[in-house]
Amino acid sequence: MSVTETEFTDAVRSAVQDRGALLYLLIQAFKEAGCATDEPVRKALFRFGQLSGARLPPATTPRAFFDGIGATGKAGLPFAREEMSVDAAQGVYHLHRCPMVAAWRNLGASPEEVVHLCELAGCGDQGLISQFPELTMHFNETIAKGDAYCAMVVARNG
């Protein structure tokens, strides 16, 4: 069976959106039950990121990292990922879509909740990058905070 690029993009975007919805609903259920949620959620998402990062090829440069996560191929399509600059020291990608933010907003999360959920979800990104000790990752802008895109920055340590 052949899948078009649009079908692939829509399917992966939908899966990421479902993951975002699940995160939101779990946190809401924990809150309703009177459970503190942030610390266990942060730990679980960080560990999930570590597991994801462990499956990726080794990388010691931003280019190798982005190639390893498929940023330069079809894997970036659901996020409308755009390479801005990548050199030996730093790589910057703009992600023009975030299916998780879309899910949270569709479920009625307040702007403050969306920012908080994004910060929690970022623990997964930090877990992933932790598997690459030569690299760091941060987001200068985020769709959750109202920016036009998420600016993913991966840099070499030191």
Language-model regions, residue ranges each:
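N-terminal accessory segment detector
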Residues: M1-L120, E134-Y149, V153-G158
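Amphipathic alpha-helical segments that form well-ordered structural scaffolds
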Residues: L120-L128
